From Swiss-Prot:
Keywords: Cell inner membrane, Cell membrane, Membrane, Protein transport, Translocation, Transmembrane, Transmembrane helix, Transport. The chain crosses the membrane at residues 2-22. Pfam families: TatA_B_E (PF02416). This is Sec-independent protein translocase protein TatB. The gene is tatB. The Tat system comprises two distinct complexes: a TatABC complex, containing multiple copies of TatA, TatB and TatC subunits, and a separate TatA complex, containing only TatA subunits. Substrates initially bind to the TatABC complex, which probably triggers association of the separate TatA complex to form the active translocon. Residues 191-200 have a biased composition (Polar residues). It is a single-pass membrane protein. One of its GO terms (molecular function) is protein transmembrane transporter activity. One of its GO terms (cellular component) is TAT protein transport complex.
Length: 200
């Protein structure tokens, strides 16, 4: 709450207030201090709210002026200004030249592409083929066939039955619960009285 006041300072202030005011009037004083702090916070929030309202009002006034300027035609749209600048005569001339060259059918090759096709100064290398002998493939391995040994006994596992499907009906049996005795009561401690101890 108060970053400049630590725990020891608060204890000292509380001790001084207890000595000066006394234990009898201290609760009333703390109540009045709490009310004063509440009023100060209320005034601060009211000031903040009025300040925010003035800021909103100034923004609304500015927006109203812009809307009035747009209605009267004085407001210039930045997108429209850029479009008007692009309609320059030189830009139109460049586009007209491009359209004329495309429609005439006379196409010029790219200067670098033309140099590659008509370059007779550089010697051309004749393609040469090297003969490489192919390695023979390995023969596939033969699978080893196990010979049955008659002397050793062979363990044969029984074949499991296939699982039943969920769609088949299964009989469900429900057993009745067995009766369970209640736990015995503990013996009472010495000095405790129970209903059986009282004799009328």
């Amino acid at each position: 709450m108060l970053p400049d006041i630590g725990g020891t300072e608060l204890l000292i202030i509380a001790a001084v207030a207890l000595i000066v005011v006394g234990p009898k009037d201290l609760p009333a004083l703390l109540r009045k201090v709490g009310q004063f702090v509440g009023r100060m916070r209320g005034m601060a929030s009211e000031f903040r709210a009025s300040f925010d309202e003035m800021a909103r009002q100034s923004e609304l006034d500015e927006l109203r002026r812009e809307v009035q300027a747009m209605r009267s035609g004085q407001f210039t749209n930045p997108v429209q200004d850029a479009a008007d600048a692009a309609r320059d005569v030189q830009v139109d001339q460049v586009f007209a030249d491009i359209d004329a060259s495309l429609s005439s059918g006379a196409m010029q090759a790219h200067p670098y592409a033309a140099g590659e096709t008509h370059n007779s100064i550089l010697p051309t290398a004749e393609p040469s083929a090297e003969i490489v002998e192919a390695k023979p493939k390995r023969a596939p391995r033969k699978k080893a066939v196990a010979e049955p040994v008659a002397a050793e006994p062979v363990l044969v596992e029984p074949v499991k039955a296939p699982r039943k499907r969920a769609s088949q009906k299964q009989e469900i049996t429900v057993e009745a619960p067995k009766a369970v005795r209640a736990p015995r009561k503990r013996a009472s401690k010495a000095g405790d009285s129970t209903a059986s101890d009282i004799v009328s």
